[in-house]
Amino acid sequence: MAEGFFSRGFSGRRRRADDARLPPGQYEEAGFPVLSAGPTPRTPLEEWDFSVLGEVDAPTRWTWEEFRALPSEEITKDIHCVTKWSKFATRWEGVPVDTLLEGVETSAGYVTAYCDGDYTTNLPLEDLTGGRAWVAFAYEGEPLAPEHGGPARLLVPHLYFWKSGKWVRGLQLTAHDIPGFWESLGYHGYGDPWREQRYWGD
């Protein structure tokens, strides 16, 4: 799937010129397209866990039951895929990354989100804090389906959606920025949709 997915020639549909919610080069999508780099992992909840590790004073790990017992938030956000579709007012429920990092002491400036299926993506730590990111477990009032990243996915709606890693299992805090899966194949290191940061050099 990676060969077909990575293409500068993807043109998408015509952008509604009067819609200020659409970043440059995007079109509004009513559905929720499924794009993945490989087969959909299906991890039983009794085997699922989530960890914060790396450049931290002490690693932290939660089982599914412990994770679901953490305070969660309902959020409504627009999302923007690098393949040029945007979906407005998507409703999620998830645990704020701020909650997962509460009490963590670190000098790290970056994070690698690692996921089932050997997927990773890299982000500045500041883009996951300050109420800007969640680990989401529900979408539109229902448990998050595996094809959309369930049982839990990272949700970083202010960046292109590949940064919201599906099937997330942990956050590794690092001193240096380490390119993730798509970033190593030519996607932009940051991925701001309003600056059209899709690929290297954008």
Question: Model-predicted segments: where are they?
Answer:
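Structured, non-membrane catalytic/scaffold regions adjacent to prosthetic-group chemistry
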Residues: 2-202
